[in-house]
Amino acid sequence: MHHHVKKSYINSQFGQVHYQIYGEGIPLILCHQSPSSLDMFNSAYPVLASLGIQSIGIDTPGYGQSDGPNSQPKILDYAQCVVDVITSIGYDKVSLLGHHTGACIVAEIASFRPGLINKIILNGPPLLTQDEKQKMLQMIEKAPSLTLKKDGSHLLKLWNKRIKFTPGWTNLDAMHNGIIQMLRADKNDIFGFKAAFDQDLESVLMRIESPTMILTNTADDIYFAALRTKELRPDFIFKELQDGTHDIVDEQPTQWSKCIADFLK
């Protein structure tokens, strides 16, 4: 079945923000992890559409085909851009899903614009201690920066870097697409991580009053943080898929989409 896809841009504080609308049905905003783009949900868009969900994928400023900030933004800045997309399309109320950094953005929106929201899905919320944030940031900052080489060896370096950050990976398409998104994000690909680590996610989570589901998978690199979120907010629905990595959408698109549809309906 062919589903209608509409791609568009809106103006934001950082320039133009790119988004796409896929299918018809219950509107669901999708916010991606870092460094990625709305393409991280490509395997799920048709499945969600077949389940009666209209997906609105958004490229966070600085990623995918959105213009980027020149200096370090906060999660609140990214969140405001997502709200701008929602209001510009004209939705009264939407549900939102965010994966990793996207979960930070979605939680932020739920805490400062609750009137816009039907339901929230936190996919792998990065509820980390200061120590864990510090270690992860050091790992990310220590990774060699991209210097172009005539023999193309810089591309292999990037490939190996993503493999190192994806233990237990199985999906070649997801790995390839991940590399494309890293190349697109270029020198500022760290902005999303830094914004996420700067946010006080715990206090933001405590302010959420919308119906919320934590969605995770048991071999996600921050699975433990989802369990921690469940402890913090036992009132949130908790759903976990088996195995998988941070490429779970490519690895298990049908199971992933069904969890979402069950919750939204």
Residue ranges and their predicted role:
Residues 1-16:
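N-terminal cap/lid segment of alpha/beta-hydrolase-fold proteins
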Residues 14-65:
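Conserved HGGG/HGGXW glycine-rich cap/lid loop of the alpha/beta-hydrolase fold
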Residues 48, 212-250:
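Conserved loop-alpha-helix segment in the C-terminal half of the alpha/beta-hydrolase fold
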Residues 50, 57-97, 101, 258:
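Active-site loop/oxyanion-hole signature of alpha/beta-hydrolase fold enzymes
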Residues 107-112, 118-149:
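Flexible "cap/lid" loop of the alpha/beta hydrolase fold
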Residues 131-132, 149-206:
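Conserved alpha/beta-hydrolase catalytic His-Asp/Glu region
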Residues 196-209, 218, 227-230:
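Serine-hydrolase catalytic core
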Residues 249-262:
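Post-His helix in hydrolase/transferase enzymes
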